[in-house]
Amino acid sequence: MLSPKRTRFRKQHRGRMKGISYRGNRICFGRYALQALEPAWITSRQIEAGRRAMTRNARRGGKLWVRIFPDKPVTVRPAETRMGSGKGSPEYWVAVVKPGRILYEISGVPEKIARKAISIAASKMPIRTQFLISE
C-alpha cells in the first residue's frame, strides 16, 4: 500500500474539492491513460487494486505508471466514543483527485489489451473515468 514515508504533521483538515485539475491532466509517460471525470478521495487500497488489475491484465511486457499518490491522512474515531476529546487517529491515506486528473498510464501493449486493462482498473475506482490515447 502507498503512503508517505514521513510528513510534517500527522493530521490534516478535510478540505474541499472545488474546480478541475490543472496539474497532472496530460499524458506524460505512456501511450494510453485513465482520466478521472469526477472529484473524489481515492484510497491507497483502491490505487493498489487498480494497479494490480492492470499489471495482471497486461501480463508480459508493457509499462505502467501510477500518476497519483495518497498523501492525505484520514482520521477515524473509535466506535462508540463520545464526542470531544480531540481528533481521531490517522487510519488510512487518500489521494485527492479532481476532474481531469490522470490516474494511470500504460504503454508497450496493443490498444485492445490496454483498453481491457484500463476498463478493469476503472471498475475498481469509486468515480467515473475515461480512456485516453496520447496524440
Curated annotation (Swiss-Prot):
BP GO terms, sorted? mitochondrial translation
Keyword Ribosomal protein applies? yes
Q: Which UniProt keywords apply?
A: Chloroplast, Plastid, Ribonucleoprotein, Ribosomal protein
Q: Which GO terms describe its molecular function?
A: rRNA binding; structural constituent of ribosome
Q: Which domain of life is it from?
A: Eukaryota
Location in the cell reads:
Plastid, Chloroplast
Q: What is this protein called?
A: Large ribosomal subunit protein uL16c
Which species? Answer: Fagopyrum esculentum subsp. ancestrale
Organism lineage string:
Eukaryota, Viridiplantae, Streptophyta, Embryophyta, Tracheophyta
